[in-house]
Curated annotation (Swiss-Prot):
Its main location: secreted. This is Thionin BTH7. The keyword Manganese does not apply. GO terms for biological process: defense response. Belongs to the plant thionin (TC 1.C.44) family. 4 C-C subfamily. It comes from Hordeum vulgare (Barley).
């Protein structure tokens, strides 16, 4: 019975990460002047707004290349974003929203293993697919 709950938790984690990953691919092609603009854009897109409409409404730009213009530097979700803590905050947020919810479902040795997998998935997601080994035993 506990195994079924663990499997369900992992499946839910993978589905949620898949949905979030799909959003990040879209967000990676927009640049905003500040964090407020980025939050506005994200909320607009989450509500179903189109990229051009959300970018115009929130003061952001849609780009086709890999880097943002100098006057639109904030949170473009690319390595050159100039935000050194973006990856750390992403990982913390992912672990808090996804992995901690799994931890509340059931406790046990299987759950610790699943939590490690979830943490590694969050780290890979937030580091643009780079594999990062977990230091947890």
């Amino acid at each position: 019975m506990a195994t079924n709950k663990s499997i369900k938790s992992v499946v839910i984690c993978v589905l949620i990460l898949g949905l979030v990953l799909e959003q990040v691919q879209v967000e990676g092609k927009s640049c905003c002047k500040n964090t407020t603009g980025r939050n506005c854009y994200n909320a607009c897109r989450f509500a179903g707004g189109s990229r051009p409409v959300c970018a115009t409404a929130c003061g952001c730009k849609i780009i086709s290349g890999p880097t943002c213009p100098r006057d639109y530097p904030k949170l473009n979700l690319l390595p050159e974003s100039g935000e050194p803590n973006v990856t750390e905050y992403c990982t913390i947020g992912c672990r808090t929203s996804v992995c901690d919810n799994m931890d509340n479902v059931s406790r046990g040795q299987e759950m610790k293993f699943d939590m490690g997998l979830c943490s590694n998935a969050c780290a890979r997601f937030c580091n643009d697919g780079e594999v990062i080994q977990s230091v947890e035993a």
